[in-house]
């Protein structure tokens, strides 16, 4: 007779499971969580690759739904033991209205929390965003900071504002009716003069570890913030991107910016004005705006070992392997574009 401790019994729900991070979490759960009985993938748009996952020993259930619809979230969650909430609307260019961003990121998160209370699901891992911390509108640097580093978080852009509000909801809900909403994870994909990046596989791996350890270490991990980090080098946007683009034949020309900073500021102001004037007529979403310029020109790096101390996190992928995998992905994307 099999040891009951080894019988797969857990049901996981991953919201936004077809997104870039969500897909990595889904695939990694199937590979690394031996207690998994059913994996529910909840997303507004379901991907075709889900079908290939349905042939394995774990039941993979694809659920098309919208986090802004409370009844759909509750129905998907019923009977789940662990929820990993990655669903969200990332928009720093103004493609979506502030109201839509708030509805998805804030109300959607509230719906997930309410569904946890309604269904008795005790464990929630929430994916936040580094933009919640900064860079702020004043352009203050965040140099080798950790989860406890004082930093004046001032936001005006709808996206970081929405993620900050959503994170606050999760923090306030922790411990409510015995619930453990913990391990809020930041995706470290910020800013420029010197920036800290992290490979998506290591971000997914940290989610797996938090979800696995949260119940046993609830007193320590519940309601905590964890920056995700690995051994990726601190470099500017351009220099870091060239780590992956150089093998594809691209070269970075020059050692100084093509345009002076004051001119970039002027251009962002002009773009913001045009976006406001044209909004009633046409959707104008320039890549360069005041927010993206501030992000790209503010040092933002992380140096912490909190996740290792709390639940034994170590990067699953080395920098060399992360770089090789990313180059392969870029080359595959390049090939599919032709």
Swiss-Prot record:
Pfam hit, one: 3Beta_HSD
Domain of life where this protein originates: Eukaryota
Function of the protein: The 3-beta-HSD enzymatic system plays a crucial role in the biosynthesis of all classes of hormonal steroids. HSD VII is active against four 7-alpha-hydroxylated sterols. Does not metabolize several different C(19/21) steroids as substrates. Involved in bile acid synthesis. Plays a key role in cell positioning and movement in lymphoid tissues by mediating degradation of 7-alpha,25-dihydroxycholesterol (7-alpha,25-OHC): 7-alpha,25-OHC acts as a ligand for the G protein-coupled receptor GPR183/EBI2, a chemotactic receptor for a number of lymphoid cells.
Bilayer topology term: Multi-pass membrane protein
Signal peptide segment: none
Enzyme class label: oxidoreductase
Residues annotated to bind NAD(+): 163
Protein name: 3 beta-hydroxysteroid dehydrogenase type 7
